Regions:
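Long, contiguous, compositionally biased segments that the model treats as domain-scale units
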Residues: 1-2
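A conserved, positively charged/aromatic
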Residues: 5-17
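Catalytic binding pocket for nucleotide-activated donors in carbohydrate/polymer assembly enzymes
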Residues: 22, 26-35, 39, 44, ...
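Nucleotide-sugar donor-binding catalytic core of glycosyltransferases
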Residues: 30-194, 216-218
């Protein structure tokens, strides 16, 4: 939210800001005094659950960005940022990937400096996201698994295990829904939303694949363990363990996929969100 300050400082009385992440909601309300509401995204219904025809073991529908530098390069002194604050926040978050960038700023410099310093953290945050996405994908590839990815951005992925990356042409949202219907496992990596979910989570479930995602408070609180598989982004070996277990045990995979589908189709379609939005508007008007 700090990167869109002009939007939040000019909100009209009565306007509502919908946020996909609970932390963002709190930030906007506390810093800007706006009326922000936690409103997670949802997915597109793509048909009834069907486990037939799943020819793709693992898919990830998302963009790749090469990390600016790695934590090892930072620790060695080979690379760094322009300011002490940026370097200290980068060091704190890479030491504990469960932290949000906002949490690190407050812990190091206090809440009073949060709005000021968050404006300088865009590339710090982006580099952290890009690094952990790269690390997770590379760890899976290094274990011998192949991942189907989509779009030319993945041609920039460099690793000793790149041969296990299957790059397909770019696809749109409707095509992604059909890809999930052909997949056994769909991967999700959050863009450091520690209290939210993505549309991709819902789309994977609605496609009947097992969703494996790095954990957030929202996912832990709104899904059961038999509906989604969660791992710590700083421990990608957990991701490999989960993939290994699911691909070896069709009964387990089918059970989780079907349970996730049922949860998503009843609570996490865009139709569900439209109903919730209309109710929210009614409550605000009343």
């Amino acid at each position: 939210p700090a990167f869109f300050e002009s939007m939040f400082t000019n909100v009209r009385q009565g306007d509502i800001i919908l946020c996909q992440d609970g932390n963002y909601t709190d930030y906007i309300n506390k810093i800007y005094g706006a009326d922000a509401v936690w409103f997670p995204p949802a997915g597109n219904y793509s048909g009834p659950y069907d486990d037939e025809g799943r020819t793709l073991d693992i898919v990830f529908v998302g963009t790749y960005y090469k990390p600016e530098f790695t934590p090892d390069e930072f620790i060695s002194g080979a690379r760094s940022y322009d300011t002490v604050e940026q370097n200290e926040v980068y060091k704190a978050v890479t030491a504990d990937p469960a932290l949000t960038v906002e949490d690190a700023v407050v812990s190091l410099y206090g809440r009073d400096r949060l709005p000021e310093l968050m404006k300088t953290m865009f590339y710090v945050r982006k580099n952290i996201i890009d690094y952990y996405r790269h690390q997770a994908v590379e760890t899976v590839l290094s274990a011998g698994y192949k991942i189907n990815v989509y779009g030319d951005s993945w041609k920039n992925f460099r690793s000793d295990y790149s041969d296990n990356l299957i790059i397909h042409q770019k696809i749109n949202v409707a095509e992604a829904s059909q890809i999930y219907r052909k997949a056994r496992i769909g991967l999700n990596f959050m863009t450091w939303h520690k209290a939210g979910m993505t549309e991709r989570v819902a789309d994977i479930m609605l496609g009947g694949a097992v969703c494996i995602s790095d954990t957030t408070t929202y996912l832990r609180e709104n899904f059961q363990k038999d509906e989604i598989v969660l791992f710590d982004i700083g421990r990608p070996e957990q991701l490999v363990t989960a993939i290994n277990q699911l691909l070896k045990d069709d009964t387990l995979r089918h059970k989780i996929a079907q349970a996730g589908y049922e949860r998503a189709v009843h609570e996490h379609t865009w139709h569900n969100r439209a109903v919730s939005l209309l109710q929210l508007i009614k409550e605000k008007k009343d």
